[in-house]
Amino acid sequence: MNINVADLLNGNYILLLFVVLALGLCLGKLRLGSVQLGNSIGVLVVSLLLGQQHFSINTDALNLGFMLFIFCVGVEAGPNFFSIFFRDGKNYLMLALVMVGSALIIALGLGKLFGWDIGLTAGMLAGSMTSTPVLVGAGDTLRHSGMEGSQLSVALDHLSLGYALTYLIGLVSLIVAARYLPKLQHQDLQTSAQQIARERGLDTDTKRKVYLPVIRAYRVGPELVAWADGKNLRELGIYRQTGCYIERIRRNGILANPDGDAVLQMGDDIALVGYPDAHARLDPSFRNGKEVFDRDLLDMRIVTEEIVVKNHNAVGRRLAQLKLTDHGCFLNRVIRSQIEMPIDDNVVLNKGDVLQVSGDARRVKTVADRIGFISIHSQVTDLLAFCAFFIVGLMIGMITFQFSNFSFGVGNAAGLLFAGIMLGFLRANHPTFGYIPQGALNMVKEFGLMVFMAGVGLSAGSGIGHSLGAVGWQMLVAGLIVSLLPVVICFLFGAYVLRMNRAMLFGAMMGARTCAPAMEIISDTARSNIPALGYAGTYAIANVLLTLAGTLIIIIWPGLG
């Protein structure tokens, strides 16, 4: 039995799609030195190669892929988008605007200089910025721009070609810039990170390990009574000195939860909760006493929960003002927009921030009720909310504005992005509404993007040979310029106009480029995770601006003549 693989793939779009995805994902795992190709470029390269052999795919799959991707981008950005946009993110908003705006202007200028069409120009912008939201926004706007037939087909093919030719150079050049640009400016990044650490009282241990608190019990003997010297627990300040917290006391056979006015007495059995190293810092009077193995005293359900910040008495306040330790709770992590932040007492909390807190289940629940709600650990997605907001996004995308002879449609990309932002924002404010597990959201977003990349690659592959010979070297030069020049402009603006701390500035610049590998290099150079504060500040807003840039470049292009 002979099987013609080419006929089999041509006759089955679904099989072809998953073959492209599988081969592309394998290719994406390859590394060039320290740089991994990545899933997007792997799938795009494989689809371009198969497209040259005249394989094609149904465009409906391509459209669904980009819709799912851009909607999920909005859902991720939603919890923090409005707080950054309206309140404490002026510098971050301005940096993201400068980065994206300068790249857009430079790309338009180079496109006109080299005589390209809008497809190549928009694709070059998307690839140079390593930004699939630009590609998605531009592709959707092209389909609603009034182009038809072969003109639209050529523009879409050139869009994916420009992206493919410049993506890798955009990624590599940004990583090189992240490695060497901090060394070319006069302020040492590590010194800048230490400076802001001193100002804000940050933990300078960037590799801090997170342990679950443990509970141990001791009997109060003469040494401990003498050490306490009649002071109550508040005056002793055991937590301030060691990091341990007295959770329970058994006195005369009766279990009680002590308050700050309690005084240790001879024969008391006390249960202390704290991290292992905190127990090691206890006064010898504790350790020299008799350790007690009292099942009831030690029977405490230590839990670790993720608390979403929501309530007005927590939003806008500094982390230290929550006084978690006064309530017997221990903070493990602070997460903003899926990015782990330094545990900084002076970090101002935004609505939607996630605090990972450990402690007695009852105490953690009390703290959660005070500042927000415990994140649902269900693995069930609220598909009704997902579908409803997806429909709303599509309906918003159908809106068209007419100005004399010029009409402008919102488009699916902008509509779905806005609907996703609203779903994410509402989820951050209402714990039982619109829940989507992060793993499910990541899977849908990644799958949608890969389907979209496979579609554009197969569509563009047939003409890549001719186009590459005509514009190849121009694309590489333009890609390098659009990748690096906005970074330099953004640095000068942030350093000399906004006068930002350099560690925060470089983190914010990488966030404006939504490039995690470059962010890791900045953190390594600074030997600190302080740049993550800046990265989180610009990341959410940049994703939105990059999508709009893809739309704007298509709208602006005809007016440039």
From Swiss-Prot:
Membrane topology listed for this record: Multi-pass membrane protein
Pfam families attached to this UniProt entry: Asp-Al_Ex, TrkA_C
Record keywords: Cell membrane, Membrane, Repeat, Transmembrane, Transmembrane helix, Transport
Entry-linked NCBIfam families: PRK04972.1, YidE_YbjL_dupl
Family matches, as PANTHER family: K(+)_H(+) ANTIPORTER SUBUNIT KHTT, TRANSPORT PROTEIN YBJL-RELATED
Name the record gives this protein: Putative transport protein Ent638_1362
Source species, domain of life: Bacteria
Residues of the RCK C-terminal domain: 202-288, 292-373
A single Gene Ontology CC term: plasma membrane
